[in-house]
């Protein structure tokens, strides 16, 4: 029997592909969709909303991990620790604004010494530098 809805006529059945794979994402679109449905954010959730939100989350995670990896490499470490995440976020203007109220456990603080606390240049040092 050719055509029709039933049976395997013509071509073999295609293997199912996840929405994450269709969108070219690593993060799970199905899980984000489930969390949106169960979170009581709205009565109805469109089909594109979880894909878009998943893409945004994946981008933010990749951006933070890239900067944290750079911070770890600057400190001659091969493993990212919370301190590296803290340094990455606080040294980036946009991420610092986005995550300004977030406390990272074991993150520490940015190294900063107020100008008034630094030692003043002595008169001898300034004279010697002017003579050269």
From Swiss-Prot:
Matching CDD domains: HFD_H2A
Domain description: The [ST]-Q motif constitutes a recognition sequence for kinases from the PI3/PI4-kinase family.
Organism phylogeny: Eukaryota, Fungi, Dikarya, Ascomycota, Saccharomycotina
Keywords: Acetylation, Chromosome, DNA damage, DNA repair, DNA-binding, Isopeptide bond, Methylation, Nucleosome core, Nucleus, Phosphoprotein, Ubl conjugation
Compartments it resides in: Nucleus; Chromosome
PTM annotation: Phosphorylated to form H2AS128ph (gamma-H2A) in response to DNA double-strand breaks (DSBs) generated by exogenous genotoxic agents and by stalled replication forks. Phosphorylation is dependent on the DNA damage checkpoint kinases MEC1/ATR and TEL1/ATM, spreads on either side of a detected DSB site and may mark the surrounding chromatin for recruitment of proteins required for DNA damage signaling and repair. N-acetylated by NAT4.
Keyword Ubl conjugation tagged: yes
Entry annotated with the keyword Nucleus: yes
N6-succinyllysine modification, residue list: 14, 22
N6-malonyllysine carried by residues: 120
Positions of modified residues (N6-acetyllysine): 5, 8
MF annotations from Gene Ontology: DNA binding; protein heterodimerization activity; structural constituent of chromatin
Designated gene of the protein: HTA1
Chain residue numbers at which the record places covalent cross-link Glycyl lysine isopeptide (Lys-Gly) (interchain with G-Cter in SUMO): 127
Protein name per UniProt: Histone H2A.1
Phosphoserine carried by residues: 129
